[in-house]
């Protein structure tokens, strides 16, 4: 639906929440460093700027440093950046607080990768869309309406990316904010629907190739989500509706003079630099307390960002920079821009409007009151009052009665029309309202932390493939390693590393079903001790592999929760627009299909768990056969056996429930047969994953076995003596303790040797540094001596120059004295007549110039006369032709005409 879209503004009746004045905040600023590209590495580029900790960006070449809210290195993933600086803006938007997230930086610094991402590493926009629908699912006591719009600013022209016909849209302002007239707003029903609209808009966006990037954005884009939320049910009719906007902005990169462009690209670059320069001026004025005028209207971008930059909502700025030394100046300018933006103060408040259904109640009450007033008036007129009326008073009462009747009737008609229109709008919007598919929970459960949901295959289909021209070659990326960020190897945070070291079974922590279905818990949740002895993955490869496996296995299950209640059984990707009616399926079939899908996903997850437990059990049994006295391994085997039995029972119950559900629904049989091949594919992938995990476990256990080889003989001897019934001698236990203490002493000695080696290395480094410092001091002393010698030479040369100049002056004076009075007479003669000669020369030159000017004027006059002569000849020829035509038409003889003509002249 095309409408006049307000940015940072709301319909009439909108007002801030009646709460205490919100505390002042500042713009959240984050800086993201991308790694060096292969081309920069081949050129031998050096690191000019780097991330010093989590909050400081420091220069390698000087002592400059800037502090921000967060600073991310090249190995940081986009999901981590979203959790740190963008998620709180999205949460505020879901509560009615406006939010803006935008990326700023030079060309090829990674802005589009940060905002949009790819299938391996989704960007901020897909993560925000996914998070919004997750919040909707976890808020069963409210209902939501989501509308999206997508526009671009190309060469200072606003274009609609969701409507190809919407070009050169007009921007105007009124008391309620900035309005983009004619932009299309689309109501979205699921993450797949929103991502498909983004992908369609990206097809219309202007891109081009530059010296730094094969596909460079040539326009600014603004993706806006308008979020309406109201209480669910009839219990809270008086509560207002919250309305907010979330702007996700991908700015085009500023270009330096080193970018060789021409023609259209040069024009695009000039417009991009102009808008970004205006943005920098606006931010500088906003941070200047003495500024009286802020130039918001100097560019389309700043006009649209006026409400966000003026402090009417939360703002998060992500500045992407490159650490290469060739772009050191551009990186410094970006960091200065981010430092200025950090000082902008904002005061975010919640926006509330009156609910449409509350307006209906208001109109109904008003109509009822008007009808009561009208009935009372009619009743009073019928019964009458004992008044000594005159005719004039009766006439006046009749007139007032008629006026009141007309007014009341018109108000009744207006109220009925407004009521009908609002009822029609509510009926239309109810089809687009998103509600949670879960049952209402208590307040305590609603405040539980939200679990991270992964992207499904349908959602990933609308994200671009991994960009090959940004940072790394594809040869360095493994096929099954989910490398986020800019293609660097995945590096977990210290907290994540400690969590990964708890064991392989940690990734089996599954989401508990909120309904009455079977609850799924991980093994470490039931028996915390069962995971302590399991080996942790020692390489990033294993970590990345299991992250991919768990996300792929959970994706389809989580996707079913993010689809609205009226679209749970839709199997295709086409979504109804505002103008098309939505086909409603019966409630029973929708619940049955939803239930069967969830049971099927639980079946797949449990089968994967059983396969993993069996592989771990097999490995533990082999280890137990080799180490007969290891009680810890036996306990783990017992725990895993219990887990396998419990999961098999759950699988059997799920199979029974699936068969019962399938028997109750006829139409679901074909869908189940179609989905069986898709069930086999995750099982095959899980088997491959389990094989890889088994090999990792084997390597770990082999390393553990080698560490305990020196105790194997003693354990076997004590075991044989225990079987024979002999008492254990005390010297054996003492020997065992001695060997254990000896092993600890050896380990400590090894550590001491390592520390001594490190100390020796540090001493050698210090020695080298001392040598270099002494060498530098020697050079400084030598240079000082040379400078002194040079200064002495310079003074000598200056004195010699003065002596030579004095000799030259004396020689000239002697020569003048030798010429005598004759030479002086000649010089006086030349000086006397030289001004006269110069005056004559100047007069001659002036006369020559005047002559040339006159000749040029004469030439121009001659040319003009020739042109006039030619023009007159043409006119004369035309006159003769006209006369000939006249003679022919009138039939006059030529001789008579000549005689008359000559006679008249005679």
Swiss-Prot record:
CDD domains: KISc_CENP_E. Residues 824-840 have a biased composition (Basic and acidic residues). ATP binds at residues 105-112. Residues 26-344 form the Kinesin motor domain. Residues 803-840 are annotated as: Disordered. GO terms for biological process: microtubule-based movement. Keywords: ATP-binding, Coiled coil, Microtubule, Motor protein, Nucleotide-binding. This is Kinesin-like protein KIN-7G. The lineage of its organism: Eukaryota, Viridiplantae, Streptophyta, Embryophyta, Tracheophyta.
């Amino acid at each position: 639906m095309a409408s006049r879209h307000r940015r940072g503004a709301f319909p009439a009746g909108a007002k801030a929440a009646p709460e205490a004045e919100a505390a002042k905040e500042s713009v959240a600023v984050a800086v993201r460093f991308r790694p060096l590209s292969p081309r920069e590495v081949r050129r031998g580029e050096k690191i000019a700027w780097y991330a010093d900790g989590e909050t400081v960006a420091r220069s390698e070449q000087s002592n400059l440093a800037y502090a921000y809210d967060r600073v991310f290195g090249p190995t940081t993933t986009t999901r981590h950046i979203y959790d740190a600086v963008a998620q709180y803006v999205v949460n505020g938007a879901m509560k009615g607080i406006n939010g803006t997230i935008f990326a700023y930086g030079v060309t090829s610094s990674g802005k589009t990768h940060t905002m949009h991402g790819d299938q391996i590493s989704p960007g901020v926009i897909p993560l925000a869309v996914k998070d919004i629908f997750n919040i909707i699912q976890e808020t069963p006591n409210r209902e939501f309406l989501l509308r999206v719009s997508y526009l671009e600013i190309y060469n200072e022209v606003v274009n609609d990316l969701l409507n190809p016909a919407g070009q050169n849209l007009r921007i105007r302002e009124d008391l309620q904010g900035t309005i983009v007239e004619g932009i299309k707003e689309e109501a979205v029903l699921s993450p797949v629907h929103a991502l498909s609209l983004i992908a369609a808009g990206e097809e219309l966006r202007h891109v081009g190739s530059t010296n730094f990037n094969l596909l460079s954005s040539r326009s600014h884009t603004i993706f806006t989500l308008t979020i309406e939320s109201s209480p669910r049910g009839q219990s809270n009719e008086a509560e207002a509706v919250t309305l907010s906007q979330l702007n996700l902005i991908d700015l085009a990169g500023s270009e330096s003079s080193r970018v060789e462009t021409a023609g259209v690209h040069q024009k695009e670059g000039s417009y991009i630099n102009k808008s970004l320069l205006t943005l920098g001026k606006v931010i500088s004025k906003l941070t200047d307390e003495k500024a009286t005028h802020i130039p918001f209207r100097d560019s389309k971008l700043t006009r649209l960002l006026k409400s966000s930059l003026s402090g009417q909502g939360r703002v998060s700025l992500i500045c992407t920079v490159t650490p290469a030394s060739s772009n050191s100046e551009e990186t410094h300018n970006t960091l200065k821009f981010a430092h200025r933006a950090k000082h902008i103060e904002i005061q975010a408040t919640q926006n509330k409007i009156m609910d449409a259904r509350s307006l209906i109640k208001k109109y109904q009450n008003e109509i009822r009151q008007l009808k009561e007033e009208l009935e009372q008036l009619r009743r009073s007129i019928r019964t009458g009052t004992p008044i000594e009326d005159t005719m004039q008073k009766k006439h006046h009462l009749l007139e007032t009665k008629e006026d009141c009747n007309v007014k009341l009737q018109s108000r009744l008609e207006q109220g009925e029309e407004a009521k009908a229109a609002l009822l029609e709008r509510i009926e239309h919007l109810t089809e687009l309202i998103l509600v949670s598919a879960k049952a209402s929970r208590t307040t305590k459960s609603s405040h539980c932390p939200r679990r991270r949901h992964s992207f499904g295959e349908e959602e990933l289909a609308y994200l671009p493939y991994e960009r090959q021209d940004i940072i790394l070659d594809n040869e360095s990326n493994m096929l099954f390693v989910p490398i986020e960020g800019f293609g660097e190897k995945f590096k977990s945070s210290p907290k994540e590393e400690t969590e990964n070291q708890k064991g392989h079974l940690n990734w089996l922590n599954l989401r508990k079903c909120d309904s009455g279905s079977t609850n799924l818990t991980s093994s470490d949740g039931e028996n915390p001790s069962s995971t302590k002895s399991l080996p942790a993955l020692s390489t990033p490869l294993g970590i990345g592999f299991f992250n991919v496996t768990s996300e792929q296995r959970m994706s389809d299950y989580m996707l079913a929760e993010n689809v609205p209640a009226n679209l749970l059984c839709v199997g295709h990707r086409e979504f109804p627009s505002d103008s098309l009616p939505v086909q409603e399926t019966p409630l029973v079939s929708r619940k049955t299909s939803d239930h069967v899908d969830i049971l099927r996903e639980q079946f797949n997850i449990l089968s994967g768990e059983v396969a993993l437990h069996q592989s771990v059990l097999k490995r533990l049994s082999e280890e137990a056969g080799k180490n007969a006295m290891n009680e810890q391994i036996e306990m783990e085997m017992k725990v895993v056996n219990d887990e396998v039995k419990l999961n098999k029972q759950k699988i059997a119950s799920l199979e029974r429930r699936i068969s019962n559900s399938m028997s109750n629904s006829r139409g679901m049989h074909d869908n189940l047969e179609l989905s069986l091949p898709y069930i086999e594919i995750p099982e095959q992938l899980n088997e491959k994953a389990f094989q890889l995990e088994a090999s990792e476990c084997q390597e770990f256990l082999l390393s553990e076995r080698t560490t305990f080889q020196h105790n194997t003989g003693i354990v076997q001897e004590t075991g044989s003596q225990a079987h024979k019934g002999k008492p254990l001698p005390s010297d054996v236990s003492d020997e065992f303790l001695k060997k254990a203490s000896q092993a600890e002493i050896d380990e400590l000695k090894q550590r001491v040797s390592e520390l001594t080696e490190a100390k020796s290395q540090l001493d050698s480094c210090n020695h080298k540094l001392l040598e270099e410092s002494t060498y530098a001091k020697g050079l400084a002393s030598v240079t000082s001596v040379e400078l002194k010698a040079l200064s002495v030479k310079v003074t000598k040369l200056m004195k010699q120059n003065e002596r030579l100049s004095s000799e030259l002056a004396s020689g000239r004076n002697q020569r003048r004295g030798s010429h005598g009075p004759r030479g002086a007479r000649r010089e006086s003669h030349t000086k006397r007549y030289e001004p006269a000669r110069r005056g004559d020369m100047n007069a001659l030159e002036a006369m020559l110039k005047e002559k040339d000017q006159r000749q040029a004027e004469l030439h121009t006059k001659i040319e003009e006369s020739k042109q006039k002569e030619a023009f007159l000849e043409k006119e004369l020829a035309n006159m003769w032709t006209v006369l000939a035509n006249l003679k022919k038409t009138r039939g006059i003889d030529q001789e008579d005409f000549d005689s008359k003509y000559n006679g008249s002249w005679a």
